[in-house]
UniProtKB/Swiss-Prot annotation:
Superkingdom, taxonomy of origin: Bacteria
Any one GO cellular component localisation term in the record: cytoplasm
Organism: Pseudomonas syringae pv. syringae (strain B728a)
Cysteine disulfide links: C235-C237, C269-C272
Keyword annotations of the record: Chaperone, Cytoplasm, Disulfide bond, Redox-active center, Zinc
Protein name (Swiss-Prot/TrEMBL): 33 kDa chaperonin
Name of the gene: hslO
Post-translational modification, as annotated: Under oxidizing conditions two disulfide bonds are formed involving the reactive cysteines. Under reducing conditions zinc is bound to the reactive cysteines and the protein is inactive.
One record GO biological process: protein refolding
CDD domains (alphabetical): Hsp33
Physiological role: Redox regulated molecular chaperone. Protects both thermally unfolding and oxidatively damaged proteins from irreversible aggregation. Plays an important role in the bacterial defense system toward oxidative stress.
Keyword Cytoplasm: yes
Cell compartment(s), UniProt: Cytoplasm
GO molecular function: protein folding chaperone; unfolded protein binding
Length: 300
């Protein structure tokens, strides 16, 4: 097994003689931070890691400033997988599951039967976009690839793997016509890179560095690998956001909540477990227009 840099990163590459680009992602530290917040069973942790890798790949592919959200829902053992990744490459994720229904070695269709996958882009400026596709693939890689078959003119394929310690992803995408103009040659070139990518095993994907993976797959094709782009875990929760949620209740309801909770309202972030506390003084200050800064404790 190769040593990895001490950061998580995505890395783009292109084929010099065909109209195909690619992206690789390696997540270790951010994946560990997400799993440290919630002790997921191994099959759930694997699915969440794959979805984190997918989100990181998509942020490197889709040009926007804002937030990308991948949300998978089902009526099965895992009713929710959710990952958010900002255009600044800050990542967080969460899963909901019924422990009694999660079995060892379970895959996507075992855990999320009849599920759906929503891809949402929430730009800092402009209109929010959402697309939804059925989780009908054998795994998340196939389901996400199916989404792009339905919604994109350019071919896009995903390979995603996670083992509870490391999450890896590979994306291949056709580019507009430039290097190859003949339609049959263009299709053959696309099938060539996909066929080779399909030979990559989970052990290789999780254990090899990017240069070795690309040499293993495409040593006969001229490929250019670009610089790494760091990615990290960061939760976007804050005391201010929690206070805004409290303010939306109105003064009377907020004061009643303080009374019902023995003098202190606790607001927990579902992603990182950060807890924000608001007492009667905080509530009065909030509705008096005094802001949300206070000496009230917060804790993880």
């Amino acid at each position: 097994m190769h040593d990895f840099p001490n950061i998580d990163f995505t890395q783009r590459f292109i084929f010099d003689e065909s109209d195909v680009r690619g992206e690789l992602v390696a997540l270790e530290r951010s994946y560990a931070e997400v799993l440290a917040k919630h002790p997921y069973p191994e099959p759930v942790a694997q699915l969440l890691g794959e979805l984190m890798a997918a989100a990181a790949l998509l942020v490197g592919t889709l040009k926007f400033d804002g937030l990308l959200i991948l949300q998978a829902r089902s009526s099965g053992a895992v009713p929710l997988l959710m990952v958010e990744c900002s255009s600044e490459r800050e990542l967080r994720g969460i899963a909901r599951y019924d422990e009694a229904l999660v079995t060892a070695g379970a895959g996507l269709q075992d855990l999320m039967p009849d599920g759906s996958l929503a891809l949402t882009i929430d730009p800092n400026k402009g209109k929010r976009y959402q697309g939804i596709v059925a989780l009908d693939g054998v795994d998340l890689s196939e389901s996400l690839s199916n989404y792009f078959v339905m919604s994109e003119q350019l071919g896009t394929r995903f390979w995603l793997k996670a083992d509870g310690h490391r999450a890896r992803g590979l994306l291949l995408q056709q580019l507009p016509i430039a290097q190859i103009t003949d339609p049959e040659e263009r299709d053959a070139s696309w099938e060539h890179v996909i066929t080779l990518a399909n030979t990559l095993t989970a052990e290789e994907m999780l254990g090899l560095d990017n240069q070795t993976i690309l040499h293993r797959l495409y040593h006969e094709d001229p490929v250019r690998l670009f610089d790494e782009q760091p990615i990290c875990f960061r939760c976007s929760c804050s005391r201010e956001r929690s206070a805004n949620a409290l303010a939306s209740l109105g003064l009377e309801d907020a004061q009643q909540l303080v009374i019902e909770h023995n003098g202190t309202i606790e607001i927990d972030c579902q992603f990182c477990n950060q807890r924000y506390l608001f007492d009667a003084t905080d509530v009065a200050q909030l509705f008096a227009g005094g802001g949300v800064d206070s000496p009230s404790d917060t804790r993880h």
